[in-house]
Amino acid sequence: MMSQRYFKLLVVFLGLFAMIASIAEGKGRHKNGGGSRKKTNTVNNGGNNGGKPKVPMCGTTAATCSKGSPSCKGGKPTCGSKGAFNACGGNVKVTC
């Protein structure tokens, strides 16, 4: 009888711990993850990918520039500081 009481207390404690842990992660008990902030699109991120800018690609690797940093503006790959893309190698084109 005494062990059942402790078992019930243990179950309640573990349940509370799980709820607190999920709230601390920002998940809560909601279908959408429970976070109070919605992810929003930022400029030049090519969709809702957590706010990270979309990077031009040479096949499966990130493209590099001779000057400046690579980015995708309006769906087209560009280099900052009037730079040019370094050669991808072969017939591979730079894509966004």
UniProtKB/Swiss-Prot annotation:
Gene Ontology terms: cellular component: extracellular region; host cell nucleolus
Biased composition (Basic residues): 28-40
Keyword Zinc among record annotations: no
Region of interest called Nucleolar localization signal, as start-end residue ranges on this chain: 29-36
Domain of life per record: Eukaryota
Induction record: Expressed during host infection.
Annotated spans, Disordered: 27-51
Leader sequence segment: 1-26
Compartments, record wording: Secreted; Host nucleus; Host nucleus, Host nucleolus
Keyword terms: Host nucleus, Secreted, Signal, Virulence
Stretches with biased composition (Low complexity): 41-51
Main location, first listed in the record: secreted
Domain comment as written in the entry: The nucleolar localization signal (residues 29 to 38) is required for host nucleolar accumulation but not for the nuclear localization, nor for the augmented plant susceptibility to pathogens.
Function: Rust effector delivered into infected tissues to modulate host functions and contribute to pathogen virulence. Binds the TGA1a-binding DNA sequence to repress the expression of genes involved in immune responses such as the defense-related transcription factors WRKY18, WRKY27, WRKY33, MYB51, the defense-related proteins NHL3, RPP8, YLS9, AZI1, CRK11 and the jasmonate pathway and regulation genes JAZ1, ASA1, ASB1.
UniProt-recorded name of the protein: Candidate secreted effector protein MPL124478
Source species of the chain: Melampsora larici-populina (strain 98AG31 / pathotype 3-4-7) (Poplar leaf rust fungus)
